[in-house]
Regions:
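Conserved catalytic core of the tyrosine transesterase superfamily
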Residues: 1-329
Length: 329
């Protein structure tokens, strides 16, 4: 059945890059999966990683590795499923080259993803979003950069990776102002900008031209801010904003929260889910439907729109004390 080393070398140097055109982030995630998996197999079989054979991999080994990730490394369900996808991808790639191993590969590819609890989606209200922006000091270069960056994030809903990869040339602030980015799956898209965002970015861009590098939001040396740096800057400003906006106290806010915030604004305005999916760069409308479950006010509004003509608007509140007690359970 052959050694694993040449299989992995061909997969990562040729197939993933040339045939699949995977993004750098996906390749790194898959690479890290196989580094962990090989170390796990090597420890279990007492065979050095470079000497492992395809025959050393069984469905039971894969399941044991996934359980090890959850129990030993405290990884969540999402990480477990990502690691499983990386293993399946390599196995599927090699299936046509190892016909005598097809049954085992099929059993590995049949291992189901694990369902986990879906966390409550977090987003900012309009007041909280404004409090966040107002809390960012603009008496320093970094403060002005951060305000421009998070103004863009809240209005456009760009992903963190999309924000950090933006170049100054990606901004088009003339007629029909927009920002161009390369999103998930290397898909290019353009996102229109509001007048307020355009004005903020035009002011920022004028100052940005005096700085080195081409990144739209650079660090001190002109290189693009890292994802961790952006999250840390956001954390600092959220903490400051919480002093004037109690709703932010204890709320875990990330750049993805700002993406959710942009989506919820559209939903509250009655924009169709298909349009929101296009705006956010979602491949499927099903991905966007998660926002429909996020806001209780939207649910109440939907209930009011569908009530019987002779029914009053609002939620049902039982008058009977026993019913009230049962409802409170």
């Amino acid at each position: 059945m052959g050694p694993l080393a040449p299989i992995l070398q061909e997969y990562f140097t040729a197939y993933a890059v040339t045939q699949r055109a995977m993004s750098g982030a996906t390749i790194r995630a898959y690479r890290d999966t196989w580094r962990l998996f090989l170390a796990f197999l090597s420890n279990a079989t007492q065979v050095p990683a470079h000497q492992l054979q395809l025959a050393h991999i069984t469905p039971a080994d894969v399941v044991a590795f996934l359980d090890h990730l959850e129990r030993g490394r405290r990884n969540g369900v999402a990480t477990r499923n990502l690691r499983l996808a990386a293993i399946k991808s390599v196995m599927a790639f090699h299936a046509s080259k190892s016909p005598d191993y097809l049954e085992v590969i099929a059993r590995i590819n049949a291992i189901p993803v694990k369902k986990g609890p879906k966390p409550q989606m977090t987003f900012l209200t309009g007041a909280e979003a404004q409090a966040l922006l107002d809390a960012i000091p603009t008496d320093t270069w970094t403060g002005r950069r951060d305000r421009a960056m998070f103004t863009l994030a809240i209005q456009t809903g760009l992903r963190l990776s999309e924000i950090t990869s933006l170049q100054a040339a990606d901004l088009h602030l003339g007629a029909a102002a927009h920002v161009a980015c390369t999103g998930k799956g290397r898909k290019n898209r353009t996102t229109p900008l509001t007048i307020a965002t355009t004005t903020a970015l035009r002011t920022y861009l004028h100052e940005r031209t005096t700085r080195p590098g081409h990144a739209l939001f650079p660090g001190p040396r002109g290189d693009a801010l890292s994802a961790d740096a952006v999250q840390q800057r956001l954390k600092v400003h959220v903490t400051r904003a919480a002093a004037s906006s109690p709703g932010l106290v204890g709320k875990h806010v990330t750049v993805h929260t700002l993406r959710h915030t942009a989506a919820m604004r559209f939903l509250e305005a009655g924009i169709d889910s298909a349009v929101i999916a296009l705006w956010l760069g979602h491949e499927s409308i099903a991905t966007t439907s998660v926002y429909l479950h996020a806001d209780m006010n939207l649910k109440r509004a939907a209930l009011d729109r569908t009530r019987q003509p002779d029914s009053p608007a609002g939620d049902y509140h039982p008058d009977d004390p026993l019913l009230a007690w049962l409802q409170s359970l």
